[in-house]
Design a protein with these regions (language model features):
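Active-site-proximal beta-strand elements of phosphoester/diester hydrolases
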Residues: 86, 124-137, 215-219, 255-265
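N-terminal, active-site-proximal structural segment of metallo-dependent hydrolase catalytic domains
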Residues: 117-179, 189, 193-200, 406
Length: 406
């Protein structure tokens, strides 16, 4: 029986398809892993598919090796003629473009012999929403900062929207972010980063080399909210707030609005009905805020918007329905890669001994309370990061959105 070459267009006497591997970096991002899966699916035929392995586990004679470089949007694909292919890209978004191009060349589960392919991927902006705190022992937060900083560095978002960014994160994580080239968005009229109460748990950071900050602001949610004629708690020690920023691309000059928020949770002082009513109030305030920002300047009238955070409610909830009156869930907009993964379980199990969340299975689709919505832009990818670092450092998973401004 003839053995078939996975990459060559003709039958050869080399190796069985199942002996072929797609090799990804040991610290591959979620988009890199998804791209490898897309290529493996395209190369699958007759129930056989190439294995996806990390560099240290590569053993096959035929490989497609994926390498991420220095953050640029270029990519290059080369083949050695013996069934091996190398994909080198500046970042995971460029790698995705190379994989999509390769998938277009696959016929009958095989990739024909190719000459070198290179190009520039479309310039995607990446926005990450990430609740970094997680409940548990406060003293353990500094131990988790390095893992979270590495996770953020791997994803390399252009805009980072963090929730529950408390004093310990400000002391430990903010210097790491600044060292990596991020600047924080001011939220007060005098250019400060903290509200008068001394907190700003919903901070926005951005890459100043890629984006210019035009305007920004923010405010905590009210301490008390009226529900059915009675005032109930509307905040938790000033930890629930909103920050916003208008950015202009340094290349291209297009502008957009990024909004980061954290809606009220189901505090013990509230009934389920009351907590829902407070979150509906939060959502209505967001709709008013977006309209008010667009009214600041005629140039902002049709401003593209990305809005999200920890909304403490499901996708089909009343608060999300309010947001959907003006914005669309990015899950519905993503046209290339997407998932609907929330945090794992009702809450991750926190281990007081280690100060981390117990390593568990990769979360399933649905069940999330972190949501992202948008308008006036194109969404390529919407993915939750389910890597090991993400699963041990918070009870929420980072959500990344890759977008193009229209």
């Amino acid at each position: 029986m003839k053995k078939r070459n996975l990459l060559a267009g003709e039958a050869t006497d080399t190796v069985l398809r199942s002996d072929m591997q797609i090799v990804i970096p040991d610290d591959a991002t979620v988009l890199c892993r998804r791209s490898a899966g897309r290529l493996a699916q395209a190369l699958t035929l007759d129930g056989l598919e190439p294995a996806i392995v990390t560099g240290q586990d590569a053993t096959a004679r035929q490989t497609v090796r994926m390498t991420l470089g220095n953050g640029g949007m270029t990519y290059r694909v080369t083949a050695d003629g013996a069934g091996n292919c190398n994909l080198t890209a500046g970042c995971d978004r460029a790698l995705q473009q190379a994989v999509l191009e390769l998938c277009g060349k696959v016929k009958n589960g095989r990739l024909p012999q190719i000459s070198a392919v290179e190009g520039n991927a479309e310039s995607l902006l990446r926005v990450m929403y990430y609740n970094v705190y997680g409940y548990g022992n406060l003293d353990s937060v500094p131990d988790r900062l390095g893992q979270q900083a590495a996770l953020i560095a791997d994803a390399a978002p252009d805009v980072l929207c963090v929730q529950e960014f408390d004093r310990l994160h400000r002391a430990g994580a903010k210097p790491l972010l600044e060292k990596a080239g991020y600047s924080e968005v001011p939220v007060t009229e005098d250019g400060g980063f903290l509200y008068p109460a001394g907190k700003n748990c919903e901070a926005i950071f951005y890459r100043a080399d890629r984006l210019e900050l035009l305007r920004s602001g923010g405010e905590p949610y009210p301490d008390r909210v009226e529900v059915d004629g009675a005032e109930v708690i509307g905040n938790n020690s000033n930890t629930k707030s909103t920050a916003w920023a208008i950015f202009r691309e340094r290349t291209g000059g297009k502008i957009f609005l990024a909004v980061n928020t954290h809606f009220m949770w189901s505090a013990p002082e509230l009934t389920g009905k009351q907590a829902n009513a407070v979150r509906v109030d939060n959502a209505r305030r967001m709709v008013v805020l977006i309209d008010a920002i667009r009214a600041l300047d005629p140039a902002y009238a049709n401003l593209a918007v990305i809005f999200g955070g920890d909304l403490n409610c499901g996708a089909d909830s009343d608060p999300c329905a309010v947001v959907k009156t003006v914005l669309t869930p990015v899950y519905d907009m993503a046209d290339t890669e997407r998932d609907n993964i929330g945090y794992y379980g009702v809450y991750a199990t926190y281990d007081e001994t280690t100060g981390q969340y117990r390593y568990g299975e990769i979360p399933c689709e649905g069940g999330g309370i972190d949501h992202v919505f948008a308008a006036g832009l194109t969404v390529r990818n919407y993915l939750a990061d389910t890597c090991f670092r993400a699963r041990i450092t918070s009870d929420h998973l980072p959500k990344t959105v890759d977008l193009i401004l229209n």
